[in-house]
Design a protein with these regions (language model features):
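N-terminal pre-domain/capping segments
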Residues: 2-138, 157-158, 165, 175, ...
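Active-site-proximal loop/turn and secondary-structure-junction residues that shape catalytic pockets
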Residues: 42-44, 77-79, 109-112, 148-152, ...
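Acidic/histidine-rich catalytic cores of soluble enzymes
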Residues: 72-73, 168-268
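A short helix->loop->beta-strand "cap" motif at the edges of active sites that frequently abuts
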Residues: 101, 179, 272-276
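Active-site groove signature of glycoside hydrolases
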Residues: 136-156, 177-186
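Active-site clefts of carbohydrate-active enzymes
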Residues: 246-254, 277-287
Length: 308
């Protein structure tokens, strides 16, 4: 089943709060503290300077984001120069200041697994991502996102044990730098809400939470199997969610995203007391990237206004 069929089917279907401290203050007004950010994949579809005729230069990203109406931007490790240096980081910080945008979340992953069963590989991954925590701090981010449990190579409970160790260590390090660590549902075990809940409850660090992705629910490959209801998945994770990836691809003539019911999703997210960022992630190709980003942002703003 492809993503569109899966989400259309799931849309017909449709919490115990762990010891997580607030990024937001509890409020009777839904989404009072929510900030809408843009994720770089919306505008840049290749990494490390790869060929992307419709893309932009990563250092122009803050100004372009501002021109599209954003005050907050996410960063992606693969969009920075492959040989990153202090000058590059300083240039990005300066360009953010010039554009009057703030950094929200640094997205990392794909260069090692902090929950690897092999201790040498796990330690190497942790060292790599601690380096990126330092960069997130220099960029002025509130949080860094990482992935864990994406690839199924060992049994469910065994993977959880190593994931707890890795997330605790990286979370402790992020906390020492004043950052939150967010683990995303990014396929594999991480797309099983119960596995993620077990991970959060066992890690139990004040600065560790979840980045909830609207569409990443692939449990296994060949054949593809999915967590059956993305809305229920977000609902189960909502006590731990501090940011979401608001995915979009195609829109109806009335401006509704055609694969995700945004109003239903944000109704559920009213139960997420720590939600601070909604990151616009447009991946479509039938309209311009700028238009897709603007439609997604407008849709989020519309449903939030309706829910208030």
């Amino acid at each position: 089943m492809n993503r569109i069929s899966f989400l259309k089917t799931s849309a017909l279907g449709t919490f115990a709060i762990g010891g997580i401290p607030t990024l937001n203050l509890f409020s009777s007004v839904p989404f009072q503290n929510l900030k809408i950010s843009i994720t770089p994949w919306s505008l840049m579809r290749t990494g490390f300077g790869g060929n992307d005729p419709q893309g932009i230069d990563v250092f122009d990203y803050p100004a372009v984001a501002k021109s599209l109406g954003f005050d907050y931007i996410d960063h992606e490790m693969f969009h920075f120069p492959k040989k990153l240096n202090e000058g590059d980081i300083e240039k990005m910080v300066s360009n953010c200041q010039k554009a009057d945008v703030k950094s929200a979340v640094l997205l990392t992953g794909g260069v090692g697994d902090i929950g690897d069963a092999d201790i040498k590989k796990r330690k190497k991954a942790l060292a790599t991502y601690k380096y990126w925590v330092d960069i997130a701090q220099k960029l002025g981010c509130k949080a860094m996102r990482n992935v864990c449990g994406e690839f199924i190579t060992i049994p469910h409970k065994e993977k959880l044990t190593y994931a707890i160790e890795g997330v605790k260590e990286l979370g402790d390090y992020a906390g020492s730098k004043g950052l939150d660590l967010l683990i995303e549902n990014h396929n594999g075990y991480s797309s099983d809400p119960e596995w993620m809940i077990d991970l959060m409850e066992n890690v139990n660090l004040k600065n560790v939470g979840v980045l909830g992705d609207f569409t990443n629910w692939t449990l296994e490959r060949n054949p593809d199997t999915f967590y059956p209801d993305p809305y229920k998945g977000i609902e189960l994770l909502s006590p731990y969610i501090r940011a979401v990836s608001a995915k979009s691809e195609t829109f109806s003539s009335s401006g509704e995203e055609t694969t995700t019911d945004y109003k239903k999703m944000f109704e559920i997210l009213q139960k997420a007391p720590h939600l601070e960022f909604a990151g616009v992630e447009f991946s479509g190709n039938t309209i311009t990237r700028n238009k897709g980003v603007q439609l997604t942002k407008a849709l989020i703003e519309k449903v939030i206004k309706e829910l208030k």
